[in-house]
From Swiss-Prot:
InterPro entries: aa-tRNA-synth_II/BPL/LPL, B3/B4_tRNA-bd, DNA-bd_dom_put_sf, Fdx_antiC-bd, Fdx_antiC-bd_sf, NA-bd_OB-fold, Phe-tRNA-ligase_IIc_bsu, Phe-tRNA-ligase_IIc_bsu_bact
GO MF annotations, alphabetized: ATP binding; magnesium ion binding; phenylalanine-tRNA ligase activity; tRNA binding
Subunit structure: Tetramer of two alpha and two beta subunits.
Name used for this protein in its record: Phenylalanine--tRNA ligase beta subunit
Cofactor: binding details: Binds 2 magnesium ions per tetramer.
Organism: Pseudomonas savastanoi pv. phaseolicola (strain 1448A / Race 6)
Subcellular localization, as worded in the UniProt entry: Cytoplasm
GO cellular component: phenylalanine-tRNA ligase complex
Catalysed transformations (reactions): tRNA(Phe) + L-phenylalanine + ATP = L-phenylalanyl-tRNA(Phe) + AMP + diphosphate + H(+)
Amino acid sequence: MKFSEQWLRGWVSPQVSRDELVARLSMAGLEVDSVTLAAGVFSGVVVGEVLSTEQHPDADKLRVCQVSNGSETFQVVCGAPNVRPGLKIPFAMIGAELPGDFKIKKAKLRGVESNGMLCSAAELQAGEGNDGLMELAADAPVGEDIRAYLSLDDASIEVDLTPNRGDCLSVAGLAREVGALYATDVTRPQIAAVSAVHDEVRPVEVLAPAACPRYLGRVIRNVDLSRPTPLWMVERLRRSDVRSIDAAVDITNYVMLELGQPLHAFDLAEINGGIRVRMAEEGEKLVLLDGQEVSLRADTLVIADHQRALAIAGVMGGEHSGVTAGTRDIFLESAFFDTISVAGKARSYGLHTDASHRYERGVDWELAREAMERATGLLLEITGGEAGPITEVVSEQHLPSIAPVTLRASRVEQMLGLVIENAEIERLLTGLGLAVTTEADGQWRVEVPSHRFDISLEVDLIEELARLYGYNRLPVRYPQARLAPQAKAEAKGDLPELRRLLVARGYQEAITYSFIDPKWFELFSPGAKPLLLANPISNDMAAMRASLWPGLVKALQHNLNRQQDRVRMFESGLRFVGQLDGLKQEPMLAGVVCGSRLPEGWAQGRDAVDFFDVKADVEAVLGFAGALGEFTFTPGQHPALHPGQTARIERDGREVGFLGAIHPELSKTLGLDRPVFVFELVLAEVSTGRLPKFHELSRFPEVRRDLALLADRDVSASAVLDVIRENAGEWLTDLRLFDVYQGKGIDPHRKSLAVGLTWQHPSRTLNDDEVNATTLAILTSLEERLNATLRK
């Protein structure tokens, strides 16, 4: 909101400087973005009158003018196209100083003496008009200093308002704030009701009362829109960053800036029948005032006549019904449109207007009649004309209402940290226009006026007290809390530590949506019934995920498409399994891996990551809480995973996750041209383990035996290792599979497994007989249980 300081001070004028006023507004939550002077720095410029003009004898585009300053006549050479006898203009006399340190001196132009300069608005930095002289009113007092006449010792102040403070999008609203801040009376202009001098009306029918609870219209006949807008109004509009167009538009803009109520003037001759406030028909066409043709949607509120739409309600009028210089009769509109009906409509059509800006933030629903009378009075004063009666349609049941709010002094003290005297609380709230009634000692009932639609709770009133009292006066108290240390189970690993573990292994954390495309749901969980949203953000975010894999794989695609060849990502979040009546929301930890095993470097190769690399990462996660031995990896089946590279992860017989390569068919469908590995774990299972136990380091030597075993190809390495552990005795300290071989020299139905076993006794040296006996027991058990024999 941009406004003229002098305009504001015409309503309320505390005895403070501009700088202090600006600082106080900012401290009260009305942040001032900029302060711009109304004109440049100049002196020696007065109101002049052109008495006569003659053609320059030696220049086609120059005129020799006789100009009066009220006491003397001066010869001035001027090239402005609009210079003419009788015109009153800014006259810079000899010795004047214009913006940019430009001093006016006596000069000769093409041999003709010139004693001064006739000025445009741009030359005084008092506007943008640079195509001709600045034309002053016919009654401008000749000889008066132009700064005083145009009140140019002024500034435009721009305030950046938060969306909840739509009540301050007017001079009246800002004046209320300033009056409350400085405990100064606000002087409103006297707005008298305009009596009707004819009885012509246009019937008004509101077919969408919820969207338009109040609509006022008035016929004003015989206006003369060729009359210029008064300079004082043009200047106030300019300093509010609004361009002057014609008298009717300028007046509606002026009243909107002054009171905060948007208005619109229609050309009465272009209205067929009466006014209908209705929802648009789907695809209905309307050419707007800016020349843009829009195809209206059915959710758009329009002002229409009996044949066609005339305007988008609260946004912009139509071109064919807009007023022009030839308009003689107008229909003036002043209405209250519900915020919901206007919100977002301007943006959806690529528009943003002063009217939509206000309606989206809220307009006082009691203001429409006062604004109508104000605009009517100004129209009759400036353009002439005859006013008819006001037609008003009101749906009381759809008008907003604000319930009284109870305020407690104890709550004020609790939230602000200081005691404000009861009398001061009442004074501050009353200054805002709130009706305060004492209910008990330290408790009030506050009636909120219609212009403060942002106040509905006790905390809103306390916020107002803090603003008016002064945020800088509130005591500084640092928060205090008695924090007891929280016990942490030693056998439990928390999520932040798991995140750090995966980051240390080269992963990056991803955060994806819980909503996925139903098509992706079917790809990763074929046959399962998705949990669909009733009101999805978009069609491709309509299902709740049953796995974290779709989001991670989509993120992988995004990275691969941007030449990121080595991708390792993990995510923690909820998966949603089942339907509403039995919905299970389960925290999961998942990852996706693709690309080379190691980052590019001179000392390592470019081998691609494989199943066992990812399995090592998963084992690091499973072993984080000290319970790796409780988990087993068994061949598994999953519709999204490769049938030969899938591991089902179990703990005590419970399924806790899956690990594997993306199924080749799924990879082809998703356009993945390289192996992609994924894992997913139930977070609760991998976060709990066993208490660590201390084992004293033995001072005695280790004994190692390496065994090369032959086993059937369908026997898993883990089954072999389990049998070895069962028979290796209590002094086994390490068991490691270090080679697997299938091929030449081996039965095609068999495979070779090389394992290393290490024993160490805590209190003595083991001898070969003991180790050999244990080794024999291991081999015997392997042969009996798994048909695994020692390779010879």
